[in-house]
Amino acid sequence: MAVAAPDLTALALLGQRVRPVSAATERMLTVPGALAGLLPHGGLQRGSLVATGGGAASTLALALVGPTTAAGGWVAVVGLPHLGLVAAAELGVDLERVLLVADPGPARWAASVAALLDAVEAVLTCPPRPVAVGVQRRLLAQARERGSVLVQVGGPTGRWATAPDLVVTATTATWRGLGEGHGHLRGRLAQVAVTGRRGADRPRRAHLWLPSPSGGIAPVAVDGTVSGVGAPSVVDPSAIGPAGRPRFEEAG
């Protein structure tokens, strides 16, 4: 569903139609299993500010909210015109549960995001300019009250007066599938790191398909290859845990 103009009255009325189906007392939004082990609480904590970064910032953000839409919840995307809907669907996002809101402009960004935090379970956006401490406090108070999550997609996290609760970053990304100048890209292998506050002060890392050849996020196979691709993986086998699951590394 698209909202062409960021009219606050229209957003408020829309919010009455798409209020979260889950109770705010359920303090976590479910995330894909391949990412759950990286997060300090195993999911996205309602009322929190999460940022995704690196070359796969959009993929990470979409993957994080995919299970929410699959469970019947709503997600809003504010001012991110290059966010790929085809990629979103491949990552498990139910597009019928996504509100696309045109860029409201810097002057109305905070008010638009606040209206949507009152209506949906997750808002994906990127602040167009530094966010004042008072504005951030109001947005997060709204998120806590309504049980929603605010997700920054790409861009510098320094735009916030207070650092995000979680920062999920994909680095050393390598696309696989092309060979000798021909073939098709089948998936992207990346190291995903999670840092932040409130239980995430010690960084955790894992190598994952982002996305996998079949879409979604998948761990590295137990034999040192990547699930779905027969070619040797560029991942150090020591990063692979039992039963094909990524071995989560804590730094520091």
What are these regions, as identified by a protein language model?
Residues 1-77, 222-252:
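Detector for small/aliphatic-rich hydrophobic stretches
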Residues 50, 76, 99-101, 151, ...:
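Hydrophobic/aromatic beta-strand patches that form the interior of the parallel beta-sheet core
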Residues 64, 113, 139:
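Aromatic/hydrophobic pocket-lining residues that form π-stacking "cages" and hydrophobic walls in ligand
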Residues 66-67, 92-93, 140-142, 209:
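Short, solvent-exposed amphipathic alpha-helical segments in soluble enzyme
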Residues 74-132, 136:
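Long, charge-dense
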Residues 117-171:
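A contiguous pocket-lining binding segment that forms or flanks enzyme active sites
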Residues 155-222:
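Phosphate-binding/switch region of NTP-binding enzymes
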